[in-house]
């Protein structure tokens, strides 16, 4: 690829969907903005690949250039400024806060959950160090003065990928894709209302249940949401489809890369499957995830995507590249494979003693019936995103948890408001 891998998602049209991530970290005490501002600008030194701004290359393509200006930290405004704007010193990230809540805003082009987590954790670590005058034991957190991990700033390329035949090719059973919900959530001003609910679970409850039912954290929430939708969707929809993202970085020799290159596993649940017990559903789900995250399958999916990006490189002109990207993106065209819902699990975050200062962690993105699951200390946090305010789905999800005797705390709904990006022309 001619340009940084971290730039290509910037060609996406943000008229409807916003391609940024907003992470909400709730501290146990009120946030001190002066300490936070200093801590954030110490922490960014650890992440030079995030301290960048967008510039135009000679072919009109987006490039990233070093940006040594201050990372902006502000009180949460009534309207969030654009990423890449002068208001945020042209950075593709900034921080705002209100009360005990710290919001980390970053372009999804530069990273996904795997890349965002270390940056957020370093910021919170440094804030705790400066605010409380302590040195918390947190070996899982990358310290501001620590060197980059081997390959942390490396980016993938087509020649890294194996060309062996995939051991498995997913064949869609044509699950329902909630078309009316999406149409209302995207185009109907009277129905569109992006928001999220926030769940807190005891990690021990989920892990114990998963262990007893041949499940993992990810497969548990896939099955739980599928069962919830089975309660409320008409019988005419014969298949409910779950989807989960997978980061195959280790499969291509880049286990420490910050870049957001993902593949997806699909689990199609025929309605008769919901007569199965939780153990059988867990086995079915995990077996599909294992098959579809095999390195041969991941490389097959990535080759298709990287080949598309190399076609973008051949187009001259910024406007022309954006048009080509929009018309040919394999993730959004007619051949794209979509499920009914998505569950993403970023894994357990080892905050060490820093967790003593943190109440909760929420990852907020665009989506409908999209769950972002994270784990910290003894808790599991779930953000439940929707494009329209329709309580029936979250109510059914709660009912499933009640039937499984899984305790939870539910908060929200909260508005899902995230910044768009301003790009050079």
Located regions from the model:
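A generic "functional-site adjacency" signal
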Residues: 30, 142, 146-151, 215, ...
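Conserved catalytic core of two-metal-ion nucleotidyltransferases
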Residues: 63-65, 143-144
């Amino acid at each position: 690829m001619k340009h940084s891998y971290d730039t290509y998602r910037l060609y996406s049209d943000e008229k409807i969907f916003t391609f940024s991530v907003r992470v909400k970290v709730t501290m146990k005490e009120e946030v001190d903005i002066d300490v936070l501002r200093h801590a954030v600008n110490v922490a960014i030194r650890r992440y030079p690949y995030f301290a960048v701004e967008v510039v135009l290359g000679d072919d009109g393509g987006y490039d990233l250039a070093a940006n040594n200006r201050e990372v902006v930290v502000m009180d949460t405004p009534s309207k969030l400024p654009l990423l890449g704007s002068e208001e945020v010193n042209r950075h593709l990230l900034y921080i705002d806060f209100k009360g005990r809540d710290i919001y980390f805003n970053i372009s999804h082009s530069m990273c996904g959950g795997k890349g965002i987590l270390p940056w957020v954790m370093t910021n919170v670590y440094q804030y705790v160090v400066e605010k409380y005058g302590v040195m918390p034991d947190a070996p899982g957190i990358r310290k501001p003065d620590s060197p980059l991990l081997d390959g942390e700033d490396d980016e993938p390329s087509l020649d890294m990928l194996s060309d062996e035949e995939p051991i498995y090719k997913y064949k869609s059973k044509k699950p329902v894709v909630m078309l009316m919900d999406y149409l209302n959530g995207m185009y109907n001003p009277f129905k569109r209302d992006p928001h999220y609910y926030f769940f807190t679970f005891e990690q021990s409850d989920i892990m114990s249940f998963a262990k007893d039912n041949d499940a993992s954290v990810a497969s548990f929430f896939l099955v739980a949401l599928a069962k919830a939708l089975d309660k409320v969707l008409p019988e005419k929809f014969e298949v409910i489809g779950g989807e989960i993202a997978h980061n195959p970085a280790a499969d291509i020799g880049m286990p420490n890369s910050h870049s957001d290159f993902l593949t997806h596993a699909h689990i199609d649940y025929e309605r008769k499957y919901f007569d199965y017990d939780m153990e059988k559903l867990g086995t079915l789900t995990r077996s599909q995830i294992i098959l579809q995250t095999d390195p041969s399958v991941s490389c097959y999916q990535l080759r298709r995507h990287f080949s598309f990006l190399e076609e973008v490189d051949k187009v001259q002109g910024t406007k022309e590249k954006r048009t080509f990207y929009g018309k040919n993106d394999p993730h959004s065209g007619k051949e794209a494979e979509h499920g009914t819902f998505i569950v993403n699990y970023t894994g357990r975050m080892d905050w060490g003693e820093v967790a003593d200062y943190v109440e909760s962690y929420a990852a907020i993105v665009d989506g409908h019936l999209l769950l972002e699951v994270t784990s910290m200390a003894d808790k599991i946090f779930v953000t439940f995103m929707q494009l329209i305010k329709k309580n029936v789905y979250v109510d059914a999800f709660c009912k499933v948890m009640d039937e499984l005797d899984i305790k939870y705390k539910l908060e929200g709904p909260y508005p899902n408001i995230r910044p768009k990006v301003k790009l050079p022309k």
